[in-house]
Amino acid sequence: MSDQQLDCALDLMRRLPPQQIEKNLSDLIDLVPSLCEDLLSSVDQPLKIARDKVVGKDYLLCDYNRDGDSYRSPWSNKYDPPLEDGAMPSARLRKLEVEANNAFDQYRDLYFEGGVSSVYLWDLDHGFAGVILIKKAGDGSKKIKGCWDSIHVVEVQEKSSGRTAHYKLTSTVMLWLQTNKSGSGTMNLGGSLTRQMEKDETVSDCSPHIANIGRLVEDMENKIRSTLNEIYFGKTKDIVNGLRSVQTFADKSKQEALKNDLVEALKRKQQC
C-alpha cells in the first residue's frame, strides 16, 4: 500500500504548482507521515539563496552542500553555521569545483542575465559527482512574476586509460510564471520537467571535464527550454485561443464560409 501511496503522492506533486511545492509537500507529509523520508528525497524543491559573509557573494542551498544544519559555500569553502568536521571535497576536486563555479557563473550571466548559480562536487570510488544549480527569479516588473530553478546532477566515471569518461546527467527544471494585467486578469502557469542523458566523452587539455559537463548542461537546458516552449506553452496558447477568440462571431462565420467555398471550388476543378 505504501508503494502505491508514494506513486500517487509523487504523481500529485508533479501536477501541482512549483511555487507551492514546500506547502504541498508539508501537507502530504502531514496526511501520510510514513512517506516523509521518501518524499523529501524524491521531490526537488525550489532553491534557496544564502549569502557568503566571507566573500560577499550569494550561493544556493541544497542537500548536496548540507551537513547537519550547516551549508557549505562554494566560494569560500566554509560552512554556515561553522562546522569543524563537515564533509569536504578532496584537494583535486576542490580545485575543479572552483573552476566549475567560475565557468557556470559566466554561463548563467550569458544565458540568464542575472540570477545565482552554484556548483558542488564530491568524490566517488571511480570518479566524482556534482550538482549544478541555477536560479533566476523575475523582479515583478511589467506585472509579470516568475522563477526558473534548474538542478543538474552529473556522475562522472573516469576510465582506466584516463583519456575518456562516462557522463550521466539528470536534469530537473522547475518553472512558473504569473501575469496580472487589468485587461486579462491573473494567470498562473507552471510545471517541472526531468530528463536524463548519458554520454562518453574524450578528456584532454583541450576538452577537460568542465568543458564536457558544460556542453551537456547547455544542450540539456536548450532541449528542456524548447520542450517547455513548444509543447507546454504552445499547448496552453492553443487552449486559450480555443476558449477565447479576438474575432467577432460574424467575422469568424465569413472566414469559415470562404474556406468552405475554396474547398468546393478545388473539388470541382479536380473533377474537371
Curated annotation (Swiss-Prot):
Phosphoserine carried by residues: 2
Keyword Acetylation part of the UniProt annotation: yes
One Pfam family recorded for the sequence: F_actin_cap_B
Residues found modified as N6-acetyllysine: 235
Entry-linked Gene3D superfamilies: 1.20.58.570, F-actin capping protein, beta subunit (3.90.1150.210)
Subcellular location: Cytoplasm, Cytoskeleton; Cytoplasm, Myofibril, Sarcomere
Residue numbers of N-acetylserine PTMs: 2
Record GO terms (molecular function): actin binding; cadherin binding
Name the UniProt record assigns to this protein: F-actin-capping protein subunit beta
